[in-house]
């Protein structure tokens, strides 16, 4: 994940994106909301039926960390809910060992470590543009939209 300020890259953060079959949708987004110690709404399938379970922050099954930065795809409603988020502190070693081989990945959301996310959530205002591009085709001049264009 690359962070820009005034068209200059100021930070690179190791990130996890969607695994095969649950790819992070490529496109232009904006940060629509931010929540500290968010409730996690997890899709689950039980007996062939899909449901959404609300898991409060602090619960042993909560996996998204201390911050949620919800994203809205520009020009259309978000199909589902994508956001930049962290990982439950008690599961960091397990999660990052499993996912940072780049073969597994997330269920679609960009994931970063909570220490970086804490910084970003405080620094980045709502409405900030987020461009999700294919990592092997990323090109700063073509894909980057500076904050002044937001």
Language-model-detected regions and their locations in the chain:
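Exported/periplasmic cell-wall-interacting domains
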Residues: 47-150
């Amino acid at each position: 994940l690359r962070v820009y300020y005034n068209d200059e890259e100021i930070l690179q953060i190791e990130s996890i994106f969607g695994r095969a079959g649950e790819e992070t949708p490529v496109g232009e987004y904006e940060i629509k909301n931010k929540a500290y110690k968010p409730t996690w709404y997890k899709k689950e399938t039980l007996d062939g039926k899909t449901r959404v379970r609300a898991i409060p922050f602090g619960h042993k099954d909560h996996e998204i960390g201390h911050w949620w930065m919800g994203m809205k795809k520009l020009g259309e409603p978000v199909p589902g809910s994508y956001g930049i988020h962290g990982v439950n502190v008690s599961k960091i070693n397990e999660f990052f060992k499993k996912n940072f081989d780049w073969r597994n990945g997330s269920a679609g959301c960009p994931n970063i470590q909570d220490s970086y996310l804490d910084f970003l959530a405080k620094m980045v205002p709502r409405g900030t543009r987020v461009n999700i591009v294919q990592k092997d085709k990323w090109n700063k001049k073509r894909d980057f939209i500076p904050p002044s264009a937001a």
